[in-house]
């Protein structure tokens, strides 16, 4: 991981690097002195949120509203999409009694982007069911600005924010030693504060502040064979049935999108080999993606002596488990989730060693981390193994894509003033 990080940061090797290490253009963490009224726009799926975030001496007050994007808007023209967003921004501002006030806005845009400045990023490709025309390759901040002009919406878009960077910013407002942000949800990614002098790909100015947050895009790690010694036959089977075959291999061993499928494949093999369920594979158990990652969380959260939750889930999948089957299935879930936590920490330890800090807080967000009963404790134990002597606190970061984006706008306002 450390070698991959260095390749991503070096301008000579960045083009072919697997872990891209994109500079976010966010140069400074909050110091708690940020004050004022800010807006945030969080667009990452078929619902988007508009938020008003009021910062008052370390205290944060938020109001927000969720808007649904119709499928014809997701798949129509870019102008239609951004005009609709501008209309919603206008409506929200009026509801907040700020119709004519020009306020700074932080824009979280959770699609693959090439960032060219703090408030400039080109869409690389649409994902998650979006296909609005005339947007790929264009600056999405510029498109939103133009829509705001067309719709007469007074807003100053000061930053485009990656959700991982937002996770770090959200936490750093209250923790001055937060230097790493981590997402452990459907996908996984990390970011951290790097010295500008270590960023060979930096194209901005080299004045103060002399740091920049790096968006690692670390889920891509492993496609050069770096993880081959750790990948099992089940990991390879999962990779075979995904649309991005051979890519995001680290993510496929860690994140919530894939853990349930890994467990299902193990169950099918053990059943076929005659070790589970009397050797009978049910049609549901034989169906890809039918064993959901939330089942791991439910099974491992069950503290009863009879593994009742496990029995309920397996019965719903059409198999009849024995008492020993239940214990085996639980053990498999634990093995898969523990491996995921340990692999995530292996990546973190490379970042922590590179930074050389003796004490730090890691801001973490994502459904896997939030909902799984032992993910956090497994991570903490592994951190003590891999980076002994460093004092590390894992802190749940609340609402990185909303509050975090507003804080990026607030820090930009503080620095420019």
Locations of regions flagged by a protein language model:
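Short glycine-aspartate micro-motif
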Residues: 36-42, 102-106, 157-159, 179-183, ...
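Conserved blade-register residue in beta-propeller folds
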Residues: 52, 190-194, 215
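A polyampholytic, Gly/Pro-enriched intrinsically disordered region
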Residues: 177-184, 202-204, 227, 231, ...
